[in-house]
Curated annotation (Swiss-Prot):
UniProt-recorded name of the protein: Chaperonin GroEL
Catalytic activity: ATP + H2O + a folded polypeptide = ADP + phosphate + an unfolded polypeptide
A Pfam family hit: Cpn60_TCP1
HAMAP family noted in UniProt: CH60
The keyword Iron is assigned to this record: no
Subcellular location: Cytoplasm
Enzyme class: isomerase
Major site of localization recorded for this protein: cytoplasm
Record: residues binding ATP: 29-32, 86-90, 413, 477-479, 493
Function: Together with its co-chaperonin GroES, plays an essential role in assisting protein folding. The GroEL-GroES system forms a nano-cage that allows encapsulation of the non-native substrate proteins and provides a physical environment optimized to promote and accelerate protein folding.
Amino acid sequence: MAKSLLFGEQARRSMEAGVDKLADTVRVTLGPKGRNVVLDKKFGSPLITNDGVTIAREIELEDPYENMGAQLVKEVATKTNDVAGDGTTTATLLAQAIIREGLKNVTAGANPIQIRTGIRKAVEKAVEEIKVISKPVNGKEDIARVAAISAASEEVGKLIADAMERVGNDGVITVEESKSMGTDLEVVEGMQFDRGYVSAYMVTDTEKMEAVLDDVYILITDKKISNIQEILPILEQIVQQGKKLLIISEDIEGEALSTLVLNKLRGTFTCVGVKAPGFGDRRKEMLQDIAILTGGEVISEELGRDLKDVTIDMLGTADSVKVTKENTTIVNGKGDKVAIKERVSQIRVQIEDTTSEFDKEKLQERLAKLAGGVAVIRVGAATETELKEEKLRIEDALAATKAAVEEGIVPGGGTAYIDIIPKIADLTSDIIDVKLGIDIIRKALEEPVRQIANNAGVEGSVIIEKVKASEAGVGYDALNDKYVDMLKTGIVDPTKVTRSALQNAASIASTFLTTEAAVADIPEKENTPPMAPGMGMDGMY
């Protein structure tokens, strides 16, 4: 395919036009008085949102060079979202400011490579200073503040703080759509996995169609059980003790299943069978997790253990087990606390080492089941459009909260960026163009406060000067139109979000400035096929 080429200033300006189109669409959403953007959907109702990355992902421009610029800034938003989960609008805004100031200097004859060196130097110093002013998150109140600022709702803040308090920092919190109008929280205590009973005849409560077993033994195996003789020795020992049994296996079928059901119906003893969770190697690991949590052993031929040789001390135990058609929940497993801690540490190491997002998510789920629990925030609203918007807000708030717990918090509303400007201004260089790069970052750091003020209907430059003249930590509360101590008032941003937004924006923007040529495909013209003979108008009468 033939290519179209642009060089130098023309290439950079065409790409900058695309950057501006995307950034100007996103920037209107920043701050407590930021607006929403409506996104057209081919199927279903339009999506109304103020989430920067969701908006950026929808934007594709017709002009190929403008689209290149837009896609580069889209990467800033996406990367920030992947790393920190929030701050995508801020990152987009910073990238636009760095590109705008940088191109002015490049046009005036400055060397883009030296400018990039200056930008990197300034960003390193800025990140250092952001970490210096960062404060750790202390307790439920701080968590609620971070979530409330991100979601622009105190109610959501309290909900997320409750969820994190109940499942711990290692717990998994998911956001789902609710069928009711309100937004509520549901917490699953203990270990839950998505496998139900193998036969409905095993239920103990026929009204609710669930089996609840108290003070229960748990047999864990990766084998398929079809012959009752294999598990008869251990069943006899359990019957003698008058206890109940949960069997977790690959499957229970044939003679084994019918015998267990028959004994349950006769009232001889209560046994519930469920299939093992997961597949392949993940199944082996999950069975091992259950074994450690309950203090049992996995009966597997790989480990040289046979079902016929199982003794009572090889079984796991728990205070209670609840089995429904779809889920099994083990509450208060009696496993050794030290062994559980070691297993948790092992999974944490695997999470750090893995590069796959899918594997990371699955490991995080396993960690939560062992260390914390699982909380579900169910989001409800009057219409589907409102529901989607609310769900996105809560997901952002959740990500911001986790980022805050990880690295701490800084004064919000762009105040942290203003507070570190004097430290950036102190940086020097003998090379003029490097100094220009430092100045570009110094100016760009003002941009979030300016935009928050503009969205609130006040003059951004005036607000910036007042914040600069105030003590460190004092910023502009756009919601109430006054200057306050941001940390004390609870207007805070996660350190990780503030840091990531600047690093990602500077990374893409500084590379953008070094562009000297742009290459794009020339769209092919569609050839209209010739008309078939006899299809013309001649000869009609």
